[in-house]
Design a protein with these regions (language model features):
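Outer-membrane pore/translocation modules
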Residues: 29-122, 149-155
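Outer-membrane beta-barrel transmembrane domain signature
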Residues: 4, 17, 88-175
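Short glycine/proline- and aromatic-enriched beta-strand/turn motifs that initiate or cap beta-hairpins
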Residues: 1-28
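Short, exposed beta-strand/loop patches in secreted or surface proteins that constitute
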Residues: 11, 85, 125
């Protein structure tokens, strides 16, 4: 949301109802935005539970207060741990609702220095156009931490989006 045009590779491995995903982002601009997210998830019917480690060094304005070391887990850690739940209403009406809350991390404090439990909620609708997977939606922040989404205020619209992607199966089966 603050980086502009970016390369965002994703690698997902699935075994039964479990999945592990590595997602990264690096921009093409001078902001040097970098993020690396590792997510474990479990699908239970139309509901998916997830736990993610979000590594982000922060924007240019807070790089002095957040460590740039990937293996730093102290008060100035660039990591956040986030719990999420996603619900796909039905196959016929594939509207998806998601709720993600930061449980801890150096940037999850409000302007007063209190733990904020920054939260992001999203409604999205998937569809396909000529074999390209698409998704349109809206994301909101019901409450926030200044170090997580850049501002410290209550409810606001974070993003309105239209995504397009193409997936390829690299290995059909490892059995």
């Amino acid at each position: 949301w603050e980086a502009g045009a970016s390369l965002q590779p994703t690698l997902t491995m699935v075994a039964g109802n479990f999945s592990a995903t590595a997602w990264g982002s690096v921009d093409f601009a001078a902001t040097s935005y970098k993020e690396m997210d590792l997510t474990l998830a479990y699908a239970l019917g139309p509901v998916t539970f997830s736990l993610a480690d979000l590594y982000w060094e922060g924007g240019a304005g807070n790089r002095g207060t957040v460590s740039r070391s990937y293996f730093r887990f102290g008060a100035d850690s660039p990591h956040r741990v986030e719990a999420g739940i996603t619900w796909r209403i039905s196959e016929r009406v594939p509207l998806t609702l998601a709720w993600n809350t930061v449980l801890f991390g150096a940037a999850d404090v409000n302007a007063r220095g209190e733990r904020a439990y920054a939260t992001y909620a999203e409604a999205s609708y998937p569809f396909a156009v000529k074999g390209v997977e698409m998704k349109a939606g809206i994301g909101i922040v019901p409450w926030n931490a200044v170090g997580t989404y850049g501002i410290d205020r209550d409810f606001y619209i974070q993003n309105i989006f239209l995504n397009a992607g193409k997936s390829w199966t690299v290995l059909g089966s490892l059995q």
